UniProtKB/Swiss-Prot annotation:
Annotated protein name in UniProt: HTH-type transcriptional regulator MalT
Domain of life: Bacteria
Gene symbol of the encoding locus: malT
Domain HTH luxR-type as annotated: residue spans: 829-894
GO BP terms: positive regulation of carbohydrate metabolic process; positive regulation of DNA-templated transcription
Classification via Gene3D superfamilies: P-loop containing nucleotide triphosphate hydrolases, Tetratricopeptide repeat domain, Winged helix-like DNA-binding domain superfamily/Winged helix DNA-binding domain
Lineage start: Bacteria, Pseudomonadati, Pseudomonadota, Gammaproteobacteria, Enterobacterales
UniProt-listed Pfam families: GerE, TPR_MalT
Transmembrane spans: none
Molecular-function annotations in GO: ATP binding; DNA binding; DNA-binding transcription factor activity
Amino acid sequence: MLIPSKLSRPVRLDHTVVRERLLAKLSGANNFRLALITSPAGYGKTTLISQWAAGKNDIGWYSLDEGDNQQERFASYLIATVQQATNGHCAICETMAQKRQYASLTSLFAQLFIELAEWHSPLYLVIDDYHLITNPVIHESMRFFIRHQPENLTLVVLSRNLPQLGIANLRVRDQLLEIGSQQLAFTHQEAKQFFDCRLSSPIEAAESSRICDDVSGWATALQLIALSARQNTHSAHKSARRLAGINASHLSDYLVDEVLDNVDLATRHFLLKSAILRSMNDALITRVTGEENGQMRLEEIERQGLFLQRMDDTGEWFCYHPLFGNFLRQRCQWELAAELPEIHRAAAESWMAQGFPSEAIHHALAAGDALMLRDILLNHAWSLFNHSELSLLEESLKALPWDSLLENPQLVLLQAWLMQSQHRYGEVNTLLARAEHEIKDIREGTMHAEFNALRAQVAINDGNPDEAERLAKLALEELPPGWFYSRIVATSVLGEVLHCKGELTRSLALMQQTEQMARQHDVWHYALWSLIQQSEILFAQGFLQTAWETQEKAFQLINEQHLEQLPMHEFLVRIRAQLLWAWARLDEAEASARSGIEVLSSYQPQQQLQCLAMLIQCSLARGDLDNARSQLNRLENLLGNGKYHSDWISNANKVRVIYWQMTGDKAAAANWLRHTAKPEFANNHFLQGQWRNIARAQILLGEFEPAEIVLEELNENARSLRLMSDLNRNLLLLNQLYWQAGRKSDAQRVLLDALKLANRTGFISHFVIEGEAMAQQLRQLIQLNTLPELEQHRAQRILREINQHHRHKFAHFDENFVERLLNHPEVPELIRTSPLTQREWQVLGLIYSGYSNEQIAGELEVAATTIKTHIRNLYQKLGVAHRQAAVQHAQKLLKMMGYGV
């Protein structure tokens, strides 16, 4: 829940000097990316910008405090500021920020700019007190923000120092509007106006000018002088002389003498107690100070000029000037040290009563009250966890003694989930084991079941499916029906375990159950995970169209719940890329893989391994070996600098081995084969994939017998487990083995099986990557004219893809080939006496390659009627009557010239 006062622009106070000369400079702020107002405390930065902002509608204001160094908190408030300025225009980003569904601040800002592209009027965002930000991630993100923000947006930053926002670059490019302390300092005229507003008896212009010079135009000093003069403690000029030459860091003594010592004791205590609040309203003041009518007391303090300012138009929220607030907090620690814990406890209770647990935790920590902190966490920690307030929770749990955690195992579980979310799997098990050892009766019942559900998730993440299955089953046996989150976790883990074991039908049912439960209870990341798993299972079963439809449901869920920034989004676009690749939609597959890389742009490069492998697959299917080699260099570098799941390694190895096959690199294949892992089983798609990689390398090396043993066993497992996509891939590799071993009838038999199975899977590219050997076999099958209609159509499609991407279009019918053919002693006399033109040779090559008339016309960029004329002429010259005879004639010519076809 966001504190309204942090998003409210300060109210323009009466009796303030209107800074006309500075407002004139700010009037052109819309021409700059950044308006930067910098000065030490007390120079009137906030007052100036609140004057400038008055009357503007498309403006948002964000007042920072120390707690805003948490990235999630900063993001929530900044997006809320944009929503304030745009009247709710950026709904997607607002949801993403509220639910913490973004990978990083920069990716959230990128989505923000997409939404703001439709906002065309000038827009202003004010960030006050930016000097409080010390988090380098936020600095880097704000540099990204400034580099990429829309032209119609101006960021206004108020800071006591020069922020780390790439200022020099903006200055060089004339995209920076700067106002510093020298410009903020009051002029003689402004000082005279100031005193005339504040003092009942005006002072002479000359004296006003001398006072202004004595304090170098420092607004806070002028305010203190006016306060002293009203309290009749000193003359204005005497106060000015005392303040001359000092700065904000040396004000404490002066403020004690001139402010605190000149108010009654009740007001002094009111100031000191209320200063612990970063923002305050009537209820907070009443609870913290013990005084009734808190609102009236605040308004009285404001009238006395004691550095209190309103934070919103309603007048409900107030805060002290930062300079004065810091001073009061220091004095409170000295003067009210014994009472301070109780004051913080009162503040925490009041914040809790108003529904702000994050602020309550801040005061409970300051009070050192472990019991209060424990109670807040017991009531609100899971809500904070689900909103990704992870840093705050971690700090809070560290502040609790271990005994307190043991007395409340729910907090131990929370700490373990925090570790799990940060991939600290070993620490999770250590923590839970320690807790179980020390907590009586924890080894049974609901809490033990929740521990087991979390342990099961850790085990499957850590690649231990047997342990994950055991723990998930135990959890489901012991969990009551109402413990929905842990039941979702355990059900999901059990479904994933069954997927790993190849029990696809049971796994699919559990993942569908997980999806249903997760949707019912709004646990959207598990709903998305279950859909991704369902798609993978359906793909493995060979139901690619149903897998596609399941992916569509997942994309819809991402859009509805704004999950675009979750790393799981990359998983989804990657399996979409795999499906598109299988169907030879290579451009779309490549685009999906690149979008996956974009989702992971803020993560370690190792996370991009799978998408990079997919890009290499696209290059290989196109026959673009140069590009594949370049990408492989990067992939192999990543492989050597990370620890990966076996599925990831299998996919990476797949593109390496295919590349070696295409380039004939037997040395690389042999070296890899000596060192690669040989899995114990082959009962899921990634283990099947690794064994297929091994068989492909063996075929390349001519080790046909061991490769055949591997592939036959893979096929047996695939058939028994209904891994139909793997069976389709295995048959294609077995076809290559038989073809290269000279077992042409066996090769044809398994190719026919593969073509038939492809009616279910829709595979195209899996055939294409086998290149010319596949093309030769498909040409023969097409010429036999015995294929069923669906298989005939698919064979022609595959042949076209091979011809398109693997550069076999006219390789045998170019000018050099024709010249050698005509000089060959066995060339048919008909061709000598009536030679074909070069264009007719090209057409014959395309006919031989399986092109239709329309495709030949498109390839040669001529009209279809022209192609018909060429075909008629070459038929006459060759003495053939139809297309199949022309193909057979071309094949004879190629054999005569020594080409294996």
